[in-house]
Amino acid sequence: MADYTNYTKQEMQAYAIAKNIKENQIVIVGTGLPLIGASLAKRAVCPSCHPIVESGLMDCSPVEVPRSVGDLRFMAHCGVQWPNIRFVGFEANEWLHDEDRLVAFIGGAQIDPYGNVNSTCIFGKGDYLQP
């Protein structure tokens, strides 16, 4: 009999992400554990979900676990390859018309010290207002 109690916190997080994705749901996915969780959902939990990533790839069906949202292995198995501007427009339009079908998972690396998503600002040694 298999021991299903021997798992890491990261494995449980990826599984929890996969289990929270519903059939036919559009899933905006960030790098890291969200990408692993969405890949697991697409392959094992609900194959009809539609993962999309900020690099413009939609309805991705990865054969291997991609390292990032721009991984070429990820690009080879997706339904649509859009420029980023179309991705943002699609996301906004979908939220306005059918918000129940849209869910997003982002990783901790995508959140700055002020709680903003990295599209707001990521800075190193500089000032927050002038990174």
Ranges and model annotations:
Residues 1-82:
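N-terminal active-site beta-alpha-beta segment that forms phosphate/nucleotide-binding
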Residues 2, 9, 65-131:
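Conserved phosphate- and dinucleotide-binding cores of soluble alpha/beta proteins
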